[in-house]
């Protein structure tokens, strides 16, 4: 004790020992700043599959879809309100990103252009024409360069080009740090350096100034050999995305084909957390839970549902770098959030435990995530009188409204997870803010008035994909009916309800028992018997019926020669790939009524128009 200290400064505990400092556990506080609703509370539409949502601290939400549309929304306590939209590109979107200060939003498309938006004024402020296809975009303010720059990697070379955000499109300088195109690019303001990953899995740290080397600072690792930055090369896997935490202490990746989620310490370059999300491991967990009859586990699901989800995971893995599944951090840097086969997991970075799961019971696979942890209502300069007024409206304006924004695999909606206090019902949470059309207006579709005819289709099932060639010239009505039903999701999650070995597999009934289904015209339509098409080979796709001119929605795929069906059933397609999938479905066990004991589900059907 210091000389002259008063008795009140002394430790006067009865045991005569110093009091232990109580270590406060803030985990519950940090979790309180995350949404607590297990299911999504709202969803909103675009007319095409959505790339990502970008929430800002100024309460603007930006959503962008692959057809080049950018929508501005305003965050409200009960969701979002639409403000304005731009048709930024008449081409397929390739990349989009917010600037670090959230003032600018940049999009890039395969029309070889960048569009620059001012977020606060909600306006398109610049167009930059490129001589290359853009890949990754990063808009940053470097203290050493004292200006706002846009870094854009080329999809065709390892080069990264730098432009002024408000400039005339002149290339300021070019950097080559990789031997393959760079698809992940982030600027670390705390270190004034870039973090980049190429499509070969190589990771680099480098300064935005010449000679573009790793910053010479004691905060960073000395040699790359001391880090885990070669891990993707060693595992022969490539990250699909790169996310940096709020204070830039960590960064995360999701890589394929090893299906690993990793968290790295920024300064040491070491992997501090590795999570295995391989679908085969999930299948093993489900089997073990079935044996234990553990229905409380997050991995518990039926075999049919497991098959459906594994098929989606394999589809995502097959598309690789184009998926861009993300693993994001909360603002406290305590938790990592990412989509998985069982929903969106919230994982503790300290020990890797799953503390929360969102969307386990939803039928979609969530991919790109973004987190809003602000208060949707703000008073610019509240007075002391206002703060002390105990007015519930004032209190509400200062309350945080944590909201998780998620896009989903092959979906035209973005989804909001918020708090349980948000009132919603499952029947009205999906907002139809766009006109629901039979088919979205993508390039390459055959249009004749309102008639839309596909050239081919891919039937995504829980056993795998079946590709079929359509015959719009021979059976235009049957193809139109099948195409429109597929695009509208009519066949989604239906089953192959009737299986007869050495004959056929039948599906297309939303009731799942062979008694339901109707055409897009709400009535039976006539047969289209073509002399050019016969049931003279297996894998012929025909309309099921109950007599002449009674076609609805059901169809079947033959597995052998069936000449007795000629003249009785409309042939509108033939399978040309995934024939093994057809055989696997055919070989499934059935009851005496030809109903499968473990039905194969149709996840959805993709239509090809070119």
Swiss-Prot record:
GO cellular component terms attached to this protein's record: nucleus
The PPIase cyclophilin-type domain, residue ranges: 453-607
InterPro entries with a match to the protein in the record: Cyclophilin-like_dom_sf, Cyclophilin-type_PPIase_CS, Cyclophilin-type_PPIase_dom, Cyclophilin_A-like, WD40/YVTN_repeat-like_dom_sf, WD40_repeat_dom_sf, WD40_rpt
Record's keyword terms, sorted: Isomerase, Nucleus, Phosphoprotein, Repeat, Rotamase, WD repeat
EC code: 5.2.1.8
Keyword Repeat: yes
Disulfide bonds: none
GO molecular function: peptidyl-prolyl cis-trans isomerase activity
SUPFAM superfamilies hit by this protein: Cyclophilin-like, WD40 repeat-like
WD repeat residue numbers: 45-83, 88-127, 177-216
Compartments, record wording: Nucleus
Family from the record: Belongs to the cyclophilin-type PPIase family.
Name the record gives this protein: Peptidyl-prolyl cis-trans isomerase 9
Gene from which this protein is expressed: cyp9
């Amino acid at each position: 004790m210091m000389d002259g200290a008063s008795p009140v400064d002394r430790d006067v505990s009865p045991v005569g020992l110093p009091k232990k400092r109580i270590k406060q556990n803030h985990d519950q506080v940090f979790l309180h700043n995350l949404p607590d609703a297990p299911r999504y509370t709202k969803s909103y539409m675009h007319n095409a599959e959505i790339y990502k949502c970008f929430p800002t601290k100024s309460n603007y939400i930006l959503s962008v879809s692959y057809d080049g549309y950018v929508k501005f929304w305003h965050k409200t306590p009960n969701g979002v309100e639409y403000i304005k939209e731009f048709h930024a590109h008449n081409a397929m979107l390739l990349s989009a990103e917010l600037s670090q200060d959230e003032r600018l939003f940049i999009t890039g498309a395969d029309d070889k252009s960048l569009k620059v938006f001012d977020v606060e004024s909600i306006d398109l402020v610049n167009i930059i024409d490129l001589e290359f296809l853009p890949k990754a975009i990063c808009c940053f303010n470097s203290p050493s360069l004292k200006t706002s720059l846009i870094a854009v990697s080329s999809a065709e070379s390892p080069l990264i080009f730098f432009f002024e955000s408000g400039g005339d499109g002149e290339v300021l300088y070019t950097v080559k740090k990789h031997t393959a195109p760079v698809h992940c690019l982030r600027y670390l303001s705390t270190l004034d350096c870039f973090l980049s990953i190429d499509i070969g899995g190589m990771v680099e740290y480098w300064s935005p100034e010449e000679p573009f080397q790793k910053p010479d600072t004691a905060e960073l690792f000395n040699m790359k050999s001391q880090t885990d930055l070669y891990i993707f090369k060693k595992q022969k896997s490539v990250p699909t995305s790169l996310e940096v935490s709020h204070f830039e202490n960590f960064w995360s990746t999701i890589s394929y084909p090893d299906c690993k989620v990793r968290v790295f310490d920024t300064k040491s370059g070491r992997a501090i957390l590795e999570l295995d999300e391989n679908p085969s491991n999930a299948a093993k967990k489900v089997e073990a839970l079935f044996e234990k009859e553990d229905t409380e586990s997050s991995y518990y699901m039926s075999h049919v549902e497991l098959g459906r989800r594994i098929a989606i995971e394999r589809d995502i893995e097959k598309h690789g770098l184009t998926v861009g599944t993300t693993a994001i951090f909360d603002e406290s840097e305590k938790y990592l959030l990412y989509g998985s086969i069982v929903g969106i997991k919230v994982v503790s970075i300290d020990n890797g435990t799953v503390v929360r799961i969102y969307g386990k019971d939803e039928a979609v696979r969530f991919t790109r995530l973004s987190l809003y942890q602000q208060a949707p209502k703000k008073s610019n300069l509240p007075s002391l009188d206002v703060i002390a007024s105990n007015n519930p409206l004032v209190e509400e304006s200062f309350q945080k409204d944590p909201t998780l924004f998620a896009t989903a695999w092959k979906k035209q909606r973005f989804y909001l997870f918020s708090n349980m206090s948000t009132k919603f019902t499952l029947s009205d949470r999906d907002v139809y803010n766009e006109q629901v059309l039979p088919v979205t207006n993508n390039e390459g579709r055959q249009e004749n008035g309102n008639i839309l005819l596909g050239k081919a289709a891919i039937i995504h099932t829980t056993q795998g994909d079946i590709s079929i060639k359509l015959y719009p010239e021979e059976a235009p009505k049957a193809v139109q009916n099948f195409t429109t039903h597929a695009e509208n999701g009519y066949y989604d999650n239906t089953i192959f309800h009737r299986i007869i070995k050495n004959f056929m597999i039948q599906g297309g009934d939303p009731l799942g028992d062979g008694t339901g289904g109707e055409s897009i015209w709400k009535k039976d339509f006539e047969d289209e018997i073509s002399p050019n098409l016969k049931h003279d080979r297996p894998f012929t796709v025909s309309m099921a019926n109950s007599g002449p001119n009674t076609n609805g929605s059901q169809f079947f795929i033959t597995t052998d020669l069936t000449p007795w069906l000629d003249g009785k059933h409309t042939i509108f397609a033939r399978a040309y790939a995934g024939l093994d999938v057809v055989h696997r479905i055919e070989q499934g066990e059935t009851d005496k009524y030809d109903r499968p004991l473990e039905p194969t589900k149709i996840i959805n059907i993709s239509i090809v128009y070119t």
